[in-house]
């Protein structure tokens, strides 16, 4: 659920403090699993494209030097809400990440361009989204691609699917030397400690 207009500013300021404290690049909003709206909670408003846009706008206002990204699946990225308080979407969303099989760079909303949008999204555990298509992304002017959920035990497949990264960046993807297990902050050596 998305904060009401009054509390969106407070929530955005809190996010900004976390980004500062942990030296994060920014935030990515994803309303894929939003819960049922609770009209008895004064901190929440009925989910809408306008409320989502307000949250992104207030977040960018609270931390203009940080990235505000959205996962383009439900209300977080919509042609219905591209202006907040007279400020256009390009000023409060930095990156739009498409769902698997969807390409928001083909028809960006408001004054966003393909450069702010992912042209391809890949999910590594389930294998959805295909292999990276670097030349297609270059040709259509996409600024980003997204890879989600690489797991150390599946790195071989991840590297294979990302082999076209050379087309985008001029060099191959480098294998990691360290990985972390679920709920464990211990650095493990890759691939020696996979067992």
Regions found by a protein language model. Give the residues of each.
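Short, small-residue-biased leader/transition segments that mark boundaries at the very start
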Residues: 2-4
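Substrate-binding cleft of secreted/luminal carbohydrate-active enzymes
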Residues: 99-107, 119-195
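Active-site groove signature of glycoside hydrolases
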Residues: 12-46, 146
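Aromatic-lined carbohydrate-recognition surfaces of secreted/lumenal glycan-active proteins
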Residues: 49-83, 93, 97-98, 121-124
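Structural recognition of the beta-strand scaffold that forms the well-ordered cores
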Residues: 25-30, 67-71, 94-99, 117-120, ...
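Active-site-proximal loop/turn and secondary-structure-junction residues that shape catalytic pockets
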Residues: 33-35, 72-76, 102, 151
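Generic structural signal for well-ordered alpha-helices
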Residues: 12-19, 49-60, 134-135, 159-166
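Short, acidic/polar
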Residues: 6-20, 76-89, 126-138
